C-alpha cells in the first residue's frame, strides 16, 4: 500500500527518489503545502509514528531527528530525552558545543512538559548535565552553569537526603572555590557532611578533601595537609565511582585530591613528594573518559606550573604551560586555553626577572600580566589571583616602580582580607618590604611575614622572609634562618635551602 502511494507521488512528480529506499519532495514548496494541508492532529499523529519507527529501527538511532519528530508530535518528555541522547553522543565525540546545543533544546522541551515531580526530575537532570558541559567549555566560574545550578536548587526539595539536591549542592563546590567564596563553600561542605551516613558514608574522604582544600586557600597549611592525607588514605575506588555518578562538575575529585596534595607538599619544600602526587594525578586523568579526564589534566597542569615556577624550574613550567594551552585549544576548553596563555606569559616574566632584565625589557611583561590579572578579576575567577599580584609586584619592583608595586600588593592583601584567602599573604608582606627605603618599615614587614609563615606551617615562605631579614640585618637574623630551616627535611632539594644553610656557616 505504501509502495503504491509513493509510486504515484513519484510519477506525479511530487517526490523524487534519492536511492532505493529514500525520497524527497521535488520542491520545498510542495513539502510546505503537504504539511499545511494536514490537520494539526494528523500532523502530530504522523510525527509520532515516524518517531516511534525511527526509534525501533536497528542500528544507531538518529537522536536529533527523533527528537524533532517527538517535538512536532508534542511529546515533550520524549523529545527532551532524545535531545539528551543526542547530547551524550556528541559529548562522546568530543563535540562540546554541539552537546551543549542539544541540551539547551532538551531543557526547552522539558519546560513544556506538564508540571509535576517527573517533569522537575527531568529538568534537573538535563540542567545538571548542561552545567557540567558549560563548566568544561567556559571554566568552573561559568555564569551559565551557575544559572542552571540555581534553577536546580529551586526545583529540588529542601532535604539533602534527596539525591537531586545532593548532586546539585555538591556540584556547586568548585564554582564557589574558583570565586574565592570560601565561607559559602565551607558551609556547603559541612552541610553535606551531616548527610554522609548509611550508603553515603563512603563519601567522607572527599568531604575531608573539600575541607583540606579550603584550609589550604585560607593559609592553614598544617590542617590542610592533615585533611588531604586522611582523604587520600581512606578513599576507595568504589567510592570514587559512586561519587562521580552523582557529581556534575568537570573536575575529577580523585585527581583533584592528588593535585592538592602536591600543593601541600610544595609548601613544605618537598619536591620528591610533589612529583609523586603529580604523577598519581596524571595517571588518574588518563583513566577517565572525555571530557572529565582532559579537563582534570588541565587542572593538574595549572597547579604544576605554579609549583614549578615557585621552585625556579622555569623550563618545565614553560613546557607545562604550552601543554595546558594545547589541551584547551584541542578540546574546546576556552578557559583553559586562556589560563595556559596567561601562565606562559607569567613564566616568561619570571624568566626575564631571573635574567636581571632591564626595566624597559620588563614593561611588556608588566602590561601583559596586568591584563590577565584584571581579566580574571572582572570574571571573579580569583582563587589564585594573589599569586599573580605578587609576581606583578616583583616585576614592578625590579623596574623601579615602587609606588605601583606597593599598590598592587595592597590590592592583593585587601582581597585576601575580604575573602579569607590567605595562602599567599606571607609573600605579599615580604615583597612589601622591598617597596620602601625605610629600614624600620622593611624590618617590620619581613618579621610579620616570617611570623605569619611560621603560624601557617609554611616553611618555604618562612625561609624567604628569613633570608631577606638576614640580607637586611646580617648575623642578628641567623635565628630566623635557623628557625625556618627546621621546617625542612635534612635531604630537602628545595632550591632555597642550600643557600640558606650557607648563611649559618
Description of each model-found segment:
Residues 369-381, 385-419, 437:
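Eukaryotic tandem repeat interaction scaffolds
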Residues 1-101, 105-113:
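Short secondary-structure boundary elements
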Residues 43-44, 60-63, 97-108, 138-150, ...:
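Helix-turn-helix repeat elements of alpha-solenoid scaffolds
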Residues 6, 47, 51, 70, ...:
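Inward-facing hydrophobic residues that define packing positions of alpha-helical scaffold repeats
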Residues 33, 68, 85-92, 108, ...:
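Tandem amphipathic alpha-helical repeat scaffolds
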Residues 63, 71, 75-172, 178-182, ...:
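Flexible inter-repeat linkers and adjacent short helices
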Residues 57-61, 73, 93-95, 113-117, ...:
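Short coil/turn linkers that connect adjacent helices within long alpha-helical scaffolds
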Residues 144, 151-154, 346, 407-505:
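C-terminal non-catalytic interaction modules
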Amino acid at each position: 500500500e505504501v509502495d503504491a502511494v509513493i509510486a504515484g507521488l513519484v510519477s506525479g512528480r511530487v517526490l523524487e527518489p534519492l536511492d532505493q529506499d529514500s525520497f524527497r519532495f521535488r520542491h520545498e514548496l510542495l513539502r510546505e503545502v503537504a504539511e499545511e494541508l494536514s490537520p494539526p492532529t494528523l500532523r502530530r499523529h504522523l510525527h509520532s509514528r515516524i518517531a516511534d519507527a525511527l526509534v525501533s529501527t536497528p542500528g544507531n538511532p538518529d537522536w536529533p531527528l527523533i527528537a524533532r519528530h517527538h517535538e512536532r508530535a508534542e511529546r515533550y518528555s520524549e523529545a527532551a530525552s532524545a535531545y539528551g541522547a543526542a547530547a551524550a553522543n556528541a559529548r562522546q565525540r568530543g563535540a562540546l558545543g554541539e552537546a551543549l546545543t542539544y541540551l539547551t533544546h532538551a531543557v526547552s522541551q522539558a519546560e513544556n512538559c506538564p508540571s509535576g515531580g517527573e517533569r522537575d526530575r527531568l529538568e534537573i537532570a538535563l540542567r545538571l548535565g548542561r552545567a557540567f558541559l558549560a563548566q568544561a567549555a567556559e571554566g568552573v566560574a561559568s555564569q551559565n552553569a551557575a544559572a542552571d545550578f540555581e534553577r536546580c536548587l529551586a526545583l529540588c526539595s529542601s532535604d539533602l537526603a534527596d539525591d537531586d539536591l545532593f548532586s546539585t549542592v555538591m556540584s556547586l563546590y568548585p564554582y564557589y572555590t574558583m570565586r574565592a567564596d570560601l565561607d559559602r563553600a565551607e558551609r556547603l561542605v559541612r552541610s553535606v557532611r551531616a548527610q554522609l551516613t548509611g550508603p553515603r558514608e563512603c563519601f567522607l574522604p572527599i568531604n575531608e578533601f573539600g575541607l583540606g582544600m579550603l584550609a589550604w586557600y585560607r593559609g592553614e597549611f598544617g590542617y590542610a595537609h592533615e585533611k588531604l592525607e586522611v582523604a587520600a588514605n581512606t578513599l576507595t575506588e568504589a567510592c570514587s565511582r559512586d561519587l562521580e555518578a552523582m557529581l556534575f562538575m568537570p573536575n575529577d575529585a580523585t585527581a583533584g585530591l592528588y593535585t592538592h596534595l602536591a600543593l601541600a607538599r610544595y609548601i613544605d619544600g618537598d619536591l620528591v613528594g610533589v612529583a609523586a602526587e603529580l604523577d598519581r594525578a596524571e595517571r588518574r586523568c588518563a583513566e577517565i573518559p572525555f571530557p572529565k579526564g582532559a579537563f582534570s589534566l588541565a587542572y593538574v597542569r595549572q597547579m604544576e606550573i605554579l609549583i614549578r615556577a615557585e621552585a625556579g624550574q622555569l623550563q618545565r613550567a614553560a613546557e607545562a604551560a604550552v601543554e595546558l594551552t594545547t589541551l584547551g585549544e584541542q578540546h574546546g576548553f576556552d578557559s583553559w586555553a586562556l589560563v595556559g596563555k596567561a601562565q606562559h606569559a607569567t613564566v616568561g616574566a619570571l624568566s626575564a626577572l631571573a635574567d636581571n632584565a632591564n626595566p624597559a625589557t620588563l614593561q611588556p611583561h608588566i602590561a601583559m600580566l596586568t591584563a590577565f590579572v584584571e581579566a580574571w578579576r572582572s570574571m571573579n575567577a580569583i582563587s589564585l589571583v594573589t599569586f599573580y599580584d605578587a609576581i606583578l609586584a616583583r616585576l614592578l619592583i625590579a623596574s623601579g616602580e615602587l609606588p605601583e608595586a606597593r599598590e598592587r600588593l595592597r590590592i592583593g592583601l585587601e582581597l585576601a582580607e575580604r575573602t579569607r584567602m590567605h595562602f599567599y599573604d606571607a609573600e605579599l608582606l615580604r615583597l612589601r618590604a622591598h617597596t620602601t627605603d625605610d629600614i624600620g618599615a622593611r624590618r617590620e614587614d619581613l618579621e610579620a611575614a616570617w611570623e605569619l609563615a611560621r603560624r601557617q606551617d609554611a616553611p618555604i615562605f618562612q625561609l624567604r622572609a628569613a633570608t631577606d631579614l638576614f640580607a637586611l640585618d646580617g648575623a642578628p637574623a641567623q635565628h630566623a634562618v635557623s628557625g625556618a630551616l627546621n621546617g625542612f627535611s635534612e635531604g630537602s632539594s628545595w632550591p632555597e635551602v642550600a643557600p640558606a644553610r650557607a648563611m649559618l656557616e
